């Protein structure tokens, strides 16, 4: 029985990896059908539906992976790092690095892969970005408590500026068909961003 469940889990992971790879390839710029996905995995469409009731559930699983990866790592940064600017730098770098390592999933983060899918999926991505922005805002607000001095500019404005930078770099990565790395020149860009945090 355990072998059967392991095989089913492995097949599910194989389907999700195949979908992510298709999103990374030129197929990712078009609607991905279950027929194309089944052919990529090497199974029938019926076999896909034995593991996932719909393509939407496949995207849900990928979004869940994105959420878990980013939020878990952000929480680790907040636990381990105490200095505000370094916390912010590491969170921004985490988002950009995740996008760079997972180009197919970056199409989901930018909404590009969700254009032909249910609106609910885009809503989940919107909620993820709202959670990240709220986390950035909290880090900015805690500066006064941690370091004795806050920011002259509203923390909500600063948080949205940082997130807009991340979203812009991820969009540029997708638009360029993954030629322009989101982390390229980050060490030169960060001082420009940090200078705005006053």
UniProtKB/Swiss-Prot annotation:
GO cellular component, one term: cytoplasm
HTH tetR-type domain: residues covered: 9-70
Keywords: Cell cycle, Cell division, Coiled coil, Cytoplasm, DNA-binding
InterPro entries from the UniProt entry: DNA-bd_HTH_TetR-type_CS, Homeodomain-like_sf, HTH-type_TetR-like_transc_reg, HTH_TetR, NO_SlmA, SlmA-like_C, Tet_transcr_reg_TetR-rel_C_sf
Coiled coil (residue ranges): 117-145
Entry keyword DNA-binding: yes
Gene Ontology BP, a term: cell division
DNA-binding region range list: 33-52
GO molecular function, one term: transcription cis-regulatory region binding
Major subcellular location class: cytoplasm
Pfam family for this entry, one: TetR_N
Subcellular location(s) of the protein: Cytoplasm, Nucleoid
Function, in words: Required for nucleoid occlusion (NO) phenomenon, which prevents Z-ring formation and cell division over the nucleoid. Acts as a DNA-associated cell division inhibitor that binds simultaneously chromosomal DNA and FtsZ, and disrupts the assembly of FtsZ polymers. SlmA-DNA-binding sequences (SBS) are dispersed on non-Ter regions of the chromosome, preventing FtsZ polymerization at these regions.
Subunit structure: Homodimer. Interacts with FtsZ.
Protein family: Belongs to the nucleoid occlusion factor SlmA family.
HAMAP family: NO_factor_SlmA
Identification of the protein by name: Nucleoid occlusion factor SlmA
Gene label: slmA
């Amino acid at each position: 029985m355990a072998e059967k469940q392991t095989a089913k889990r492995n097949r599910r992971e194989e389907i999700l990896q195949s979908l992510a790879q298709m999103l990374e390839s030129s197929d990712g710029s078009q609607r991905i059908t279950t027929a194309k996905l089944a052919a990529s995995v090497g199974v029938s469409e019926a076999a896909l539906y034995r593991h996932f009731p719909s393509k939407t559930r496949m995207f849900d699983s990928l979004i869940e992976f994105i959420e878990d990866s980013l939020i878990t790592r952000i929480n680790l940064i907040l636990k381990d790092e105490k200095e505000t600017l370094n916390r912010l730098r590491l969170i921004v770098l985490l988002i950009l690095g995740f996008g760079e390592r997972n180009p197919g999933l970056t199409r989901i983060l930018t909404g590009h892969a969700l254009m032909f899918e249910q609106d609910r999926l885009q809503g989940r991505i919107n909620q993820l970005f709202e959670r990240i922005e709220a986390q950035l805002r909290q880090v900015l607000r805690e500066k006064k408590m941690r370091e004795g001095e806050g920011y002259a500019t509203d923390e909500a404005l600063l948080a949205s500026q940082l997130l807009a930078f991340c979203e812009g770099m991820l969009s540029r990565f997708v638009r360029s068909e993954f030629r322009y790395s989101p982390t390229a020149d980050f060490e030169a860009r960060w001082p420009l961003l940090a200078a705005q945090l006053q």
